[in-house]
Regions:
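Secondary-structure boundary elements
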Residues: 67-70, 77-397
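His-Asp-centered catalytic microenvironments across diverse enzyme cores
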Residues: 368, 383, 398-399, 441-442, ...
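Hydrophobic/aromatic-rich core segments of domains that either
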Residues: 190-195, 199-201, 213, 386-396, ...
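Extended amphipathic alpha-helical coiled-coil/heptad-repeat regions
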Residues: 516, 520-524, 530-714
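Intrinsically disordered, low-structural-confidence terminal and linker regions
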Residues: 23-66, 70
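Bacterial N-terminal signal peptides
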Residues: 8-17
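Short amphipathic alpha-helical segments that mediate assembly, nucleic-acid/protein binding
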Residues: 27-31, 39, 53-54, 78-81, ...
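Bacterial N-terminal signal peptides that target proteins for export
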Residues: 1-8
Length: 715
């Protein structure tokens, strides 16, 4: 990466450039000048590092203004993007990078400028948590990449080799593989038997159901852990073969193949873990399991693999049956970023891809196994057995099962394997998935959630990085939705707003503060989903009035846009961001200022409990706060939405908890909560048609704060 002094000098020059280019015509007019300047500086930086870039490669980028903006205008330092694009071209060839899969190449180059790839991959194989790359992409001359899918890395060891002394792992494997067959219960899917009507005609057959069957097979490590009798045999066998110190005691069916209960006995859990480690280590040492997980692919290998699959020649019938392509890989690069982030090892991908390609298998949900999944060691012990893949792989998730995190991983990874951008996502106490999709009729893109459990888009945070603002990191679902909506509203205008952000960031702080409102007005006129510009403007707002003005500018542009007007979550998210900025700024100095600010906040339907509380206290101290919160409780009780909307009930409960947090002292907090409960007397429960009466979550929260017991339900 460039030396810090070089970056500092570049920043100074960009400040001058941006200040001159913006002028009176606004930030959009500076986009082309900024891109041209960054092009020159980036090519100079490449040359200074000895990175040879062919003239025709540079000319190819220059020939397409949108491509040039994407390469030179979307990162503060475009050099990693430029070199990654060239590196991909060296490995994959001009046809893939310059013609058929340019957008995928840009997405990978952009993604890899944010998140470094490593041999081990990332925890959930979506680049979440990856560090910024320390090295630049390699553009040295080399032969084109030949895509090779690794084979099974296991090399079985002869555990009876007479030419050497057998070790403890040999004996463990020999016990298992030489043992007589045992009865084992397995779950299988079977179609129900055919039924016939009175005329002897077969009725439509039902769906396959899971049934348990007993089969004969040699024991696995998991079988020994599950059986006290097999444990006794194992201990005797190991002692007879010179290893009396190797003993296991896991109880009888404390953990078994279909266990769902967690192990609460700490000593028992430790003994089961020891047994698991014995079998697992023996399987790995003797080639029954891989010694380690396969390495993650390079960016070129990853792209080559996706391109190869995209070019697969399905016949028309199979293409229709597979709904192929699941997502167009020539889609604009911003909507491909979650796919570009995938770093699953190729062999793991290939196994799932082959089943999809040949048999149409597309499974996005595995076996849900209950509380034992919260104990990874016990989850692993219940099914430890030979397998061609390691822990962390989707194949191991299929074998072992899990809870929501495993299900989300299976879903997101499977979507990406078939070429569809996807990621896991967090909800309160739950893991879900999100994915990009394209409407076949309208051609529009959307970011959609799946496996939701504890709320909708409004409580969902995507794990894949939101890599559009030069910072990256996790963002709420709506941020990723704005990418799809923004591309629908105009791919080039969307990229223009990303370049505008770079121009804006290069301005001096005082100039950014002065232009905060105009940035939003001008940016959203170009593309109404430029949330990155809104964030930047709010961060630069020097006082509450400026933040209020930024939100007003946003609302005016969104209201004028047919595409954006109905996006309520987008609008409330920006509203909440604006009011969070107001809260972070100094409060008004007197009651008059607090009242004026409160009027503006109420006009903007402020839902920030802490900010409202600060304003109320600024107007009239604690008595004003108490009166205002009681008024809010009465309005909530009289609202018809209270009975209709669980979301509204939970929102008010959250506000009540936030207000309580602002009350100092345990006794004062309890007194405030008791007063807040008074309007709820006789109305503590919610009656929803078709359901049992349930306690209002606000009442539950206030009772805990007040230290009062639950009262009998009233009508």
């Amino acid at each position: 990466m460039p030396h810090p002094r070089t970056l500092a000098a570049l920043f100074v020059s960009l400040v001058v450039l941006a200040s001159r280019a913006v002028g009176a015509d606004g930030l959009l007019s500076a986009v082309d000048a900024y891109v041209a300047e960054m092009r020159g500086r980036t090519l100079e930086a490449a040359s200074a590092r000895g990175a040879a870039l062919p003239a025709d490669f540079v000319a190819w980028i220059d020939s397409d203004p949108l491509l040039a903006k994407s390469v030179y205008g979307c990162r503060k330092d475009p050099l990693p993007v430029l070199l990654a694009l060239r590196s991909l071209e060296i490995d994959l060839g001009e046809d893939a990078v310059r013609r058929t899969h340019t957008q995928l190449a840009i997405a990978i180059a952009m993604q890899d400028s944010y998140a470094a790839r490593g041999a081990q991959g990332t925890g959930w194989n979506d680049a979440d948590g990856a560090k910024t790359p320390a090295a630049l992409p390699d553009v040295s001359p080399r032969t084109p990449l030949s895509l090779v899918i690794p084979g099974d890395p296991r090399v079985p060891v002869d555990t009876k080799d007479p030419s050497r002394t057998l070790d403890v792992h040999d004996h463990i494997v020999n016990f298992l593989e030489d043992h007589a067959e045992i009865d084992a219960e397995i779950a299988v899917k079977e179609l129900p038997p055919l039924e016939y009507d009175e005329k002897g005609v077969a009725k439509p057959q039902g769906k396959a159901v899971t049934v348990m069957k007993t089969v004969r097979r040699r024991p696995l490590g998991a079988d020994v852990i599950a059986s006290a009798a097999l444990q006794a045999e194992f201990n005797a066998f190991m002692a007879a073969n010179g290893h009396p110190e190797v003993r296991i005691d896991c109880g009888d069916r404390a953990v078994h193949w279909y266990s769902t209960e967690a192990i609460s006995d700490k000593d028992l859990r430790a003994r089961i873990k020891t047994a698991h480690d014995l079998f697992h280590d023996a399987y790995r040492a003797k080639g029954r399991m891989p010694a380690e997980r396969d390495r993650a692919p390079t960016m070129a290998e990853s792209m080559a693999w996706f391109v190869r699959n995209d070019r697969h020649a399905f016949d028309d019938a199979t293409r229709a049956a597979r709904q192929w392509p699941r997502f167009p890989l020539d889609a604009p690069w911003p909507v491909l970023m979650m796919l570009a982030a995938d770093d699953q090892p190729l062999r793991e991908r290939e196994d799932i891809w082959t089943k999809f390609r040949d048999a149409g298998e597309f499974r996005t949900y595995g076996e849900y196994i209950g509380d034992i999944a919260q104990q990874f060691d016990m989850q692993s012990a219940r099914r430890v057995a030979p397998i061609a893949f390691s822990y962390g792989s989707i194949q191991m998730m299929w074998k072992d099962g899990g809870v929501c995190g495993t299900m989300g991983n299976i879903g997101a990874r499977t979507h990406r394997i078939v070429g569809q951008p996807a990621s896991t996502a967090g909800q309160p106490g739950h893991c879900a998935i999100v994915f990009m999709e394209r409407d076949a009729k309208t051609g529009e893109f959307r970011c959609k959630g799946g496996q939701y459990a504890t709320g909708g888009d409004e409580v969902t945070t995507v794990h894949a990085g939101w890599n559009y603002d030069d910072r990256g990191g996790r963002r709420p679902m709506v941020f990723h939705q704005t990418v799809a909506w923004g591309v629908n509203a105009g791919f080039e205008p969307f990229v223009d707003t990303l370049v505008m952000l770079r121009v804006y960031d290069a301005l001096p702080p005082e100039e950014r503060a002065r232009r905060a409102t105009s940035l939003v007005d001008e940016g959203l006129a170009r593309n109404p989903f430029a949330i990155a510009l809104v964030e930047a403007a709010l961060a630069a707002a020097p006082d509450p009035a400026a933040a209020i003005a930024v939100l007003d500018a946003f609302e005016a542009r969104v209201e004028a846009s047919d595409a954006a007007r109905g996006r309520e979550l987008y609008r409330t998210t920006v509203r909440d961001l604006a009011h969070a900025r107001v809260l972070a700024l100094p409060a008004p100095a007197d009651a008059t200022g607090a009242a004026a600010l409160l009027a503006e906040l109420e006009r903007q339907s402020c839902a920030n409990a802490r900010l409202l509380a600060r304003c109320w206290r600024g107007i009239g101290g604690e008595s004003e706060f108490n009166a205002r919160t009681l008024d809010a409780a009465r309005r909530y009780l009289s609202s018809p939405e209270r009975a209709k909307s669980k979301r509204d009930r939970e929102a008010f409960a959250a506000m009540a908890r936030a207000w309580a947090d602002s009350v100092k002292g345990k006794a004062a907090k309890a007194a405030w909560a008791s007063a807040m409960l008074e309007p709820f007397a006789g109305h503590e429960t919610i009656e929803v048609r078709g359901k049992k009466p349930a306690q209002d979550p606000a009442v539950e929260a206030l009772r805990k704060l007040a230290g009062t017991p639950a009262a009998p339900a009233h009508g």
